[in-house]
């Protein structure tokens, strides 16, 4: 019974597997030196077909030649590596040559920054414009005539035991400041009792007050001193309390 099953085993496989793929078929003469086929020995074709079902020849023979119906192709590891290397070089060479020709990463001279591209200069121009505007403004301010008013707050003649103090004030309206300062000096002298209502004493005080303001202030402010003194004199003459 086992012999019958073994002989009929090849009928379970397709007929196209009868072709030998791994090695050429051995003729009957080379299978047995005496030329006699033993009935109990399975045929070589059957064993080869059985091995093809359970063994992956591609794993053991990765570069085995396979016969195709139309044409035959032979591949070798050396040829594969050389072809892949040449294709890799052909793909990389144009990119490298193009990058080198464009001189993208090469600089002829050092710049003000480490950036690849030149940075715009709107901020520097803005700073220079602001600096120019500030310079023009300061020049205009210097050209504008600002008067340095020296105001005497007290004198030894008007208040006994005091000292003369000079105060430097930059005023946009020198005439008003001189008039107010002179009025304060006259009021302080009257309140302190240093200034009497004697007309002669009044003239002497006003004369000394005018000369003091003219001597303590620069020449370009004398016109404001005289105008302020004239206003004070007119106001004193119009008041009920006259010192002249």
Swiss-Prot record:
One of its GO terms (cellular component) is nucleus. It comes from the Eukaryota. Pfam families: Ovate. Residues 166-235 form the OVATE domain. Residues 63-91, 111-131 are annotated as: Disordered. Residues 69-87 have a biased composition (Low complexity). GO terms for biological process: negative regulation of DNA-templated transcription. Expressed in roots, rosette and cauline leaves, shoots, stems, flower buds and siliques. Disruption phenotype: No visible phenotype under normal growth conditions. It is found in: Nucleus. Keywords: Nucleus, Repressor, Transcription, Transcription regulation. Plants over-expressing OFP16 show small rosette size, late flowering, reduced fertilization and blunt-end siliques. Transcriptional repressor that regulates multiple aspects of plant growth and development through the regulation of BEL1-LIKE (BLH) and KNOX TALE (KNAT) homeodomain transcription factors. NCBIfam families: A_thal_3678. This is Transcription repressor OFP16. It comes from Arabidopsis thaliana. The lineage of its organism: Eukaryota, Viridiplantae, Streptophyta, Embryophyta, Tracheophyta. The gene is OFP16.
């Amino acid at each position: 019974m086992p012999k019958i099953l073994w002989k009929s085993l090849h009928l379970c496989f397709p007929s196209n597997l009868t072709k030998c793929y791994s090695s050429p078929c051995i003729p009957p003469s080379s299978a047995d030196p005496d030329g006699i086929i033993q009935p109990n020995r399975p045929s070589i074709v059957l064993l080869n077909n059985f091995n093809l079902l359970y063994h992956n020849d591609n794993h053991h023979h990765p570069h085995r030649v396979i016969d195709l119906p139309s044409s035959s192709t032979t591949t070798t590891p050396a040829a594969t590596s050389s072809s892949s290397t040449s294709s890799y070089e052909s793909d990389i060479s144009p990119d490298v040559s193009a990058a080198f020709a464009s001189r993208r990463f090469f600089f002829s001279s050092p710049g003000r920054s480490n950036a690849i591209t030149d940075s715009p200069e709107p901020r520097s121009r803005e700073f220079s414009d602001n600096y120019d505007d500030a310079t023009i403004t300061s020049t205009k301010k210097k050209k504008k005539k600002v008067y340095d008013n020296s105001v005497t707050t007290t004198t030894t003649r008007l208040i006994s035991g005091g000292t003369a103090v000079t105060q430097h004030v930059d005023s946009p309206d020198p005439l008003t400041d001189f008039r107010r300062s002179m009025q304060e000096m006259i009021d302080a002298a009257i309140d302190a009792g240093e200034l009497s209502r004697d007309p002669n004493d009044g003239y002497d005080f006003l004369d000394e007050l005018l000369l003091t303001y003219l001597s303590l202030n620069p020449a370009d402010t004398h016109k404001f001193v005289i105008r302020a003194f004239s206003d004070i004199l007119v106001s004193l003459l119009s008041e009920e309390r006259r010192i002249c």
